[in-house]
A protein has these predicted regions:
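Subset of Sec-pathway N-terminal targeting signals
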Residues: 1-201
Length: 201
């Protein structure tokens, strides 16, 4: 490929927020870059868990605020399957049935960056006394490339004493803060992205 045909790269995907009992309020900061010598266009695709409501979105490009659209599960399904069929990420098959947020990213100027911010509110599911949070990190995708770093920092507060808190992801660090709280942090490089899964009671 010619030097100016470099794909868009995801240089940062960062999640911050808080959980109070069963309600999570999360903010996603997504940074992507055009490393080439010509304008490029991309598409931001972010899966939305069934228990999540999009409460805010901001992306300023060339001084103008860009809007996105919420796709219901039936619409999002064909996009997930299309990505899988091109062997970009077979793991996305597990997301079929979930909604998706989509936004066009244009223009991304040569050597330039664009920052998108999404805010979500989730009422977390509870089963057998266990509350579960799933943060879509691995599955965030740009139609023209991926890479960069991912990180998360989430504070947890509960009305009752926190008995158990664990994650299936070995990269997640959990720091207990008294009987009713904890801080969850996670940071990963450009390979092997995983979603953040957390269970507590």
């Amino acid at each position: 490929l010619p030097p100016d045909a470099s794909p868009i790269t995801l240089t940062g995907y960062h999640v911050e927020g808080s959980i109070t009992d069963q309600v999570a309020e999360l903010s996603y900061r997504i940074v992507f870059r055009n490393p080439g010598d010509r304008r490029l266009e991309g598409v931001l695709l972010v899966p939305l868990p069934a228990d999540a409501a999009l409460s805010g979105f901001s992306m300023i490009i060339a001084g103008k605020e860009t809007k996105g659209e919420l796709l219901e599960a039936s619409q999002a399904s064909s996009i997930y399957q299309s990505i899988v069929s091109r062997a970009i990420d077979p793991g996305l098959l597990e997301l079929v049935g979930e909604r998706m947020f989509r936004a066009k990213v244009f223009p991304i100027e040569p050597r330039g960056e664009v920052v998108a911010t999404l805010k979500m509110t989730q009422t977390l599911s509870k089963s057998g006394g266990l509350v579960t949070l799933s943060v879509p990190m691995r599955s965030a995708r740009f139609a023209q490339g991926e890479g960069g770093r991912t990180s998360a920092r989430i504070s947890l507060k509960t009305s009752r004493a926190l008995r158990t808190i664990l994650s299936s992801n070995s990269e997640v660090r959990i720091a207990r803060e008294g009987e009713h709280g904890a801080t969850i942090s996670y940071e990963e490089g450009s390979t092997g992205h995983q979603d953040l899964a957390l269970t507590f009671s």
